């Protein structure tokens, strides 16, 4: 059972996921390979923006920029209570985890949008982490 605040977070996360998949799928359907290129670049830009903002917030708080602080200090979004992972390692240099339940992946599956989900995961995370780490 989820709290009212958690339910709001769940609705926000699902709404964002649905918006991304509908937009990305339509762009790719309309423009083909060029559309996929556009979606990938836009997703990387979003990742870089979030990474840059999180980096600046941590610098403003005098937090050392490393993997531990990226995943352990002042998250930029509320955590989705449905998300489950085995965190295998989190140090200043390395993060290793195994995702058990990803609510975004469940939405992509439900909407038949695995391609959009794959693009998001391939492009967003790397761009976000690199921008956070190196600015």
Label each residue range with its predicted role:
Residues 1-124, 131-134:
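N-terminal accessory segment detector
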């Amino acid at each position: 059972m989820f709290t009212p605040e958690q339910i709001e977070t769940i609705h926000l996360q699902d709404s964002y996921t649905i918006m991304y998949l509908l937009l990305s799928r339509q762009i790719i359907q309309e423009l083909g390979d060029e559309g996929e290129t556009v979606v990938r670049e836009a997703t990387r830009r979003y990742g870089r923006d979030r990474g840059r903002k999180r980096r600046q917030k941590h610098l403003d708080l005098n937090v050392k920029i490393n993997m531990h602080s990226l995943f352990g200090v002042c998250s930029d979004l509320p955590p989705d209570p449905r998300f489950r992972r085995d965190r295998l390692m989190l140090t200043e240099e390395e993060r290793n985890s195994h995702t058990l339940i990803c609510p975004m992946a469940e939405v992509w599956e439900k909407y038949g949008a695995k391609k959009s989900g794959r693009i998001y995961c391939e492009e967003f995370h790397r761009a976000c982490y690199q921008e956070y780490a190196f600015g």
